[in-house]
Amino acid sequence: MSDKIGLFTGSFDPMTNGHLDIIERASRLFDKLYVGIFFNPHKQGFLPLENRKRGLEKALGHLENVEVVASHDELVVDVAKRLGATFLVRGLRNAADLQYEASFDYYNHQLSSDIETIYLHSRPEHLYISSSGVRELLKFGQDIACHVPESILEEIRNEKKD
């Protein structure tokens, strides 16, 4: 029997504890789980890609079957095919997330009917955490330690020093 391989993607700008929870839970469902950082090289992100990747790798270091990869200018289904992933993992906080994700699921299925999308609901304590919310708190000098993994906090602090 072949390995079950999943792919969970996002911009992770920055990664939140909600992302971490979904990844930890998804890692138990698959033999291998790729976490794909998708970024636009023509758009200035909050954290540079290198910092995001390093922070994610540290935050996920305890998960032996998880590997962080980065991609740009590529469709998610093409990355999944390249990595041998037959499952896309998506986290849902609310009905708006489901509606947003459903349109991507439609197109992904049209492009590759072999790839299934699996939705994991956010835990109640993570329902209102978002990367954009964390960025907004940071903009106004607020503490975000309860919203992001320690390794991400370190990357943000290091980036602010520069």
UniProtKB/Swiss-Prot annotation:
GO terms for biological process: coenzyme A biosynthetic process. Its EC number is 2.7.7.3. GO terms for molecular function: ATP binding; pantetheine-phosphate adenylyltransferase activity. It is an enzyme of class 2 (transferase). ATP binds at residues 11-12, 19, 91-93, 101, 126-132. Its main location: cytoplasm. Pathway: Cofactor biosynthesis; coenzyme A biosynthesis; CoA from (R)-pantothenate: step 4/5. It holds the Pfam family CTP_transf_like. Reversibly transfers an adenylyl group from ATP to 4'-phosphopantetheine, yielding dephospho-CoA (dPCoA) and pyrophosphate. This is Phosphopantetheine adenylyltransferase. It comes from Streptococcus pneumoniae (strain P1031).
